[in-house]
Structures are given as C-alpha cells and as structure tokens.
C-alpha cells in the first residue's frame, strides 16, 4: 500500500455524545473534540506511514470541513479542507490511483438506535436506503471507493448495532 485516502468525520470520534461537541459555534464543547479528531487522523497516518505508505491524502469530511488542524498532522500528509461541491462529497479527491481507503470518526446511520448522533449525510434526512437497507455514510462512501476499484482497509466507526451493519 503506497497511496492512502483517509476520510474523516467527527460524530464517531472517541467520546462524542452531544451535537454541541461537533459544532464550531460552540467552542467550549467543540474544541476538545476537534483536537481529538485531529489526533485520531494523525494516529491513522502514523500507522499507515509505519506500514510503508508514502502518499496520504486526508479529506476533512465534517460540516464545514475545517475541523482537522493541519499543523498537528505529520508533514508527509495532504489535507483537503472545505467543500468542492463535487458529487463524491466526503470522498472528494479519491480516484482509482489510490491503494486503499481508511475512515475515521464515522458513525451509525439515521434511525439507528444507541447513538445520539446517528444521521446520514445531514440531519434533514430521516433515512437513506440502498436496496431497501438503511445506509450509513460508511456504506455510501465505501460504494464510491468500490466503484473506483479502491478497497476499504479500516473503519474507525461508532456502530450502535454491529450485527445490522455487518449483515450488509
């Protein structure tokens, strides 16, 4: 694996339990978790680099897409911040030249019990289904990777009902 794409969300970041912790407009709640998101992404990068990865592209994929602090990431990384209004959305920058995808901070789908931050793409969607099944962002973005022939290597995700997700 020489070239890795990392898509990073925040709602599945360790310790998050409230929407305020995901919102830049509430800095006394948000700042800690934005730093935690950055630490988790940095850890994924360090592990990939130690395993021989030479090119790491990170897509900050939460809300404003300005959550990860690039200054706290290893020098050998590149980060896409903000939104390009591209159909790949949270996967912007991914193409068939990548050897793999890693997801950090992902979460369960809208309508899944057990996670107070469950949603799919935005809180306006009551649910999103693919072939009749509730589809979390992880599934939708894995399908984008699959369509390009890029395998998913790792997902750091909060799953409220693993058996339902694994039955996909």
Predicted regions and their residues:
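N-terminal glycine-rich anion-binding loops that anchor highly charged ligand groups
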Residues: 5-22, 33, 37
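Short beta-strand segments
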Residues: 7-8, 59-60, 101-106, 155-156
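Glycine-rich nucleotide/cofactor/substrate-binding loop typically near the N-terminus or early
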Residues: 15-20, 40-96
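A solvent-exposed, charged loop/short amphipathic helix patch at secondary-structure junctions
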Residues: 18-32, 119-131
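Active-site glycine-rich loop that binds ribose-phosphate moieties when present
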Residues: 85, 122-148, 157
């Amino acid at each position: 694996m020489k070239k890795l794409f990392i898509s990073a969300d925040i709602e599945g970041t360790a310790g998050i339990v409230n929407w305020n912790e995901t919102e830049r407009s509430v800095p006394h709640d948000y700042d800690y978790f934005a730093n935690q998101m950055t630490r988790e992404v940095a850890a994924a990068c360090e592990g990939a680099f130690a395993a021989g990865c030479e090119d790491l592209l990170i897509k900050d994929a939460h809300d404003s897409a300005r959550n990860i602090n690039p200054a706290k990431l290893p020098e050998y990384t590149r980060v896409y911040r903000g939104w390009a209004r591209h159909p790949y959305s949270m996967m912007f920058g991914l193409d068939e030249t990548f050897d793999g995808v890693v997801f950090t901070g992902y979460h369960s789908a809208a309508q899944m019990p057990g996670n107070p931050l469950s949603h799919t793409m935005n809180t306006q969607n009551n649910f999103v289904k693919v072939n009749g099944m509730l589809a979390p962002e992880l599934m939708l973005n894995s399908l984008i990777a699959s369509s390009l022939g890029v395998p998913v290597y790792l997902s750091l995700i909060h799953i409220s009902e693993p058996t339902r997700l694994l039955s996909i």
